[in-house]
Amino acid sequence: MAPLRPLLILALLAWVALADQESCKGRCTEGFNVDKKCQCDELCSYYQSCCTDYTAECKPQVTRGDVFTMPEDEYTVYDDGEEKNNATVHEQVGGPSLTSDLQAQSKGNPEQTPVLKPEEEAPAPEVGASKPEGIDSRPETLHPGRPQPPAEEELCSGKPFDAFTDLKNGSLFAFRGQYCYELDEKAVRPGYPKLIRDVWGIEGPIDAAFTRINCQGKTYLFKGSQYWRFEDGVLDPDYPRNISDGFDGIPDNVDAALALPAHSYSGRERVYFFKGKQYWEYQFQHQPSQEECEGSSLSAVFEHFAMMQRDSWEDIFELLFWGRTSAGTRQPQFISRDWHGVPGQVDAAMAGRIYISGMAPRPSLAKKQRFRHRNRKGYRSQRGHSRGRNQNSRRPSRATWLSLFSSEESNLGANNYDDYRMDWLVPATCEPIQSVFFFSGDKYYRVNLRTRRVDTVDPPYPRSIAQYWLGCPAPGHL
């Protein structure tokens, strides 16, 4: 027995050393560490790379102040002293407000530049991209071969949109004809619309757009038989490419596209393409690893999704985002059969951000709260500087947790919603809900991804794009 004692001591020491190496003790703020076998950063839950003691050492107490609590197209103003509106909502809504110092922050930080930036001084129409904001459109004298710009765009014309997508920094872009818009927390950002060719280096109109929800957050624009891929606003080398080369089985001249995340790093990202009365589901073969994304700014949209993995909703995420086991394109299906309440043909589509039901104020508190500010999409980094990333890459206007709505209900001038019945706001359980937006003509629909049915609200869907997304006046309020 005595000869075994030294071996036992050595084994115990080895176990202690290994446990120390694989522990999160003292590592919770170091970020991703390529030299370690397990990780202790905020995204390790998504990548399934956490050390065994991550929860005990690093995971903060679950608080619901760092998540969205409503879909982005619902925002209610609770104000006892102002005019009542006769609209009553029947969806799960409620949420934090936009802080009033955002615009001051934007003005006070001129060094925080937009993500999009030119690839070269004067790019040809299809090989570069420029900043969407902060620089003047290039004079036509720099491009004598270009056609003259089309007639001035009318914001509230009611014409259909070609595409909607949110960029990796949380900015929301809408495309219509030759022009694109950037939408902020209220309506359209100052200086827009701009010609698509002056912002993205592509001659408009485009057919569809989406941004992948992974750590890289690359944006894809589709036109005819080709597609363009951008990273941090710069066109990737060797683009444009044929759709048939990059998305086998997807037709040319698509009408719309929307992207969904993988439920975890072991899952697959999906994109839905829509054309005519049919849609196609495409699954990506790979998603970038955490190590591959260390050299670039992290997608704020993906970061919000990935950090929600810490709150033990794995089963629900699998239900929402679990795809087929094989990558590639699925056979086309009919829109009207699988997306209940959506018209048989759509012009544009976009995935909304995930919000958490069951977090709205109780009826007794609802009318005491005043939510003065509103926003369609808003993401804030929870990571600090632990990864050594450039935190200025995100738009100042989307640098804090904003309210969960677009400007739908909040942009109706003096109409206030202080007569809501709030009992429906708090369901029996608290769980994530993913919305999908479909745009058709001058109207849009919001669909619950889990049920694939149009949400029931009053006033009902479809609703006006111009009124609720662009800040145009409601009929009778001109």
Curated annotation (Swiss-Prot):
Q: Any S-S bridges, and between which cysteines? A: 24-28, 24-40, 28-58, 38-40, 38-51, 44-50, 51-58, 293-430
Q: Where is the composition biased (Basic residues)?
A: 365-388
Q: Where is the SMB domain?
A: 20-63
Example GO biological process:
positive regulation of cell-substrate adhesion
Q: Where is this region: Disordered?
A: 91-158, 364-398
Instruction: Spell out the GO cellular component terms annotated for this protein, sorted alphabetically and separated by semicolons.
Output: alphav-beta3 integrin-vitronectin complex; basement membrane; blood microparticle; collagen-containing extracellular matrix; endoplasmic reticulum; extracellular exosome; extracellular region; extracellular space
- Residues modified to Phosphothreonine: 69, 76
Name assigned to this protein: Vitronectin
Where in the sequence is the signal peptide annotated?
Answer: 1-19
Q: Sorted alphabetically, which SMART domains does this protein's record hold?
A: HX (SM00120), SO (SM00201)
UniProt motif (Cell attachment site) ranges = 64-66
Tissue specificity as recorded in UniProt: Expressed in the retina pigment epithelium (at protein level). Expressed in plasma (at protein level). Expressed in serum (at protein level).
Q: Where is the composition biased (Basic and acidic residues)?
A: 133-143
User: Which ranges are annotated Polar residues under compositional bias?
Assistant: 97-112
Q: Where is this region: Heparin-binding?
A: 362-395
Q: How would you summarize the oligomeric state and partners of this protein? A: Exists in two forms: a single chain 75 kDa form (V75) and a clipped form composed of two chains (65 kDa and 10 kDa) (V65+V10) which are held together by a disulfide bond. Interacts with SERPINE1/PAI1, insulin and C1QBP.
List-wise, which residues carry Phosphoserine? 130, 137, 312, 397
Q: Outcome of mutating residue 69 to E, per the record? A: Abolishes phosphorylation by CK2 and enhances adhesion and spreading
